[in-house]
């Protein structure tokens, strides 16, 4: 997902409806640090497509795989770290390709 995936689009009720969960679950996930939606000037939570994708991961891990929230936190941290490392590898491969020319 590009930068457009980070644009805040959905208020909490719409995000909950998209995901098929209750709004209090979204508030709890935020409190636990699993998700951090942007806030409007009026302090309204706004969820991006990237947030929705992450919340789908949370839902899958909890409902389908029975992982508790502490486990989900660790898994999401590892996913983020792997993603960061993959981006770094791609950058280094590009640099290496330039130096070989």
Give the positions of each predicted feature.
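Long, leucine- and charge-enriched amphipathic alpha-helices
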Residues: 63-101
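Basic helix-turn-helix/winged-helix DNA-binding cores
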Residues: 1-56, 60
């Amino acid at each position: 997902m590009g930068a457009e995936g980070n644009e805040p689009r959905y208020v909490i009720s719409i995000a909950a409806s998209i995901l098929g969960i209750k709004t209090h679950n979204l508030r709890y996930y935020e409190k636990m640090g699993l998700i951090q939606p942007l806030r409007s000037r009026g302090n309204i939570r706004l969820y991006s497509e990237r947030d929705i994708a992450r919340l789908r991961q949370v839902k899958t891990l909890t409902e389908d795989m029975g992982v508790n929230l502490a486990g989900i936190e660790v898994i999401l941290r590892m996913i983020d770290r792997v993603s960061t490392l993959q981006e770094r590898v791609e950058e280094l491969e590009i640099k290496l390709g330039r130096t070989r020319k």
